[in-house]
A protein has these predicted regions:
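Flexible "cap/lid" loop of the alpha/beta hydrolase fold
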Residues: 127, 131-171
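Conserved alpha/beta-hydrolase catalytic His-Asp/Glu region
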Residues: 146, 173-234
Length: 314
């Protein structure tokens, strides 16, 4: 589904994976997984956000797969992972743990990048054995750990009960999104992207978001409304870097700053002027560079490969 409804060409068109597999989570949920790049290359795992799919990471996959093994999966109910009646942060953690166990060798380390709900998945799974075993470093893009509805600035009012009530009604709406029209693009850009985002970026995100089933969109909106993962943030003991758009209306910079203050080992916080919530699409080179740098710094095989390349070019 995610490949059929995404843009057909350009940097945001989903690359064809080297292989695909279905992973079964603890409760029986079936999770669609794609693997790109050389099998023995340093591993990167990508977890997308609410209403998205593996297609959201197309730009990162395209660049990283040249010299990394890139593992991307569809969150339950999204993309090509079938819907499941279980909604909650524990099922998200179950799914991530199952993906790590199925795609990484015992003791193998990877960089884990999560955008929005994907970042929340990382926080929810912070104490899971598979995360402790396999995750060498984390990149959190445009995410938060609690008070999401209260802190969102989609509604242009001051913080308070009225704004929170209106935001809850908007984000939790059961209304169908319908086809991707010029009006739909304008609405999506206002809510999720910065003023500098080009039409090709808006088109890519609109196609991905509009492909999400209405029931799935609403079900996960209820989880995000009640989200409280502050405890999970404190359990992320590996190096963690954060990226946020300064114009992010869904998880504003205040969320990123709170994460940076709470993390045991925050190695950087980058606030991107003029960008919104969809940072991997709006700033693809920067996000890809952050992932690549974390892999080079924290995965032994990546460090060795970088040293070999340096010697060859000397």
């Amino acid at each position: 589904m995610s490949r059929l409804l995404s843009v057909p060409g350009g940097p945001y068109a989903p690359p064809v994976p080297a292989r695909e597999l279905t992973v079964t989570a603890a409760d029986g949920a079936r999770i669609h997984v794609e693997v790109h790049g050389p099998e023995r290359a340093p591993a990167v795992v990508l977890a997308h956000g609410w209403c998205c799919s593996t297609a959201f990471w197309a730009a990162q996959i395209r660049e990283l797969a040249a010299d990394h093994r890139v593992i991307a999966y569809d969150q339950r109910g999204h993309g090509r992972s079938p819907a499941n009646p279980a909604y909650g942060t524990e099922p998200l953690a179950d799914d991530l743990e199952a993906v790590l166990a199925a795609t990484l060798a015992p003791g193998e380390r990877a960089v884990l990048a999560g955008h929005s709900m994907g970042g929340m998945t990382v926080m929810a799974a912070a104490t899971r054995p598979a995360v402790r075993e396999h995750v060498a470093a984390v990149l959190l893009c445009s995410t938060g750990s609690s008070r999401l509805v209260a802190s969102a600035t989609v509604v242009p009012l001051g913080e308070g009960r009225v704004r929170t009530w209106l935001t809850r009604r908007i984000l939790g709406s059961r209304a169908p999104l319908g086809p991707v029209t010029p009006l739909a693009r304008r609405i999506l850009k206002y809510g999720t992207m910065g003023p500098g985002s080009g039409p090709h970026m808006v088109e890519a995100c609109a196609r991905i978001v509009h492909a999400c089933p209405r029931r799935v969109r609403h079900g996960w909106s209820q989880v995000l409304d009640l989200l409280d993962l502050d405890h999970g943030v404190r359990e992320l003991r590996m190096p963690v870097e954060i990226v946020v758009g300064a114009a992010d209306r869904l998880t504003p910079p205040s969320q990123a700053r709170a994460l940076a203050a709470a993390l045991p080992d925050c190695v950087g916080l980058t606030e991107l002027e003029g960008l919104g919530h969809m940072t991997p699409v709006e700033a693809p080179e920067l996000v890809t560079g952050k992932i690549r740098a974390l892999a080079a710094a924290h995965i032994p095989s990546a460090r060795a490969e970088r040293a070999v390349h340096a010697e060859e070019s000397a």
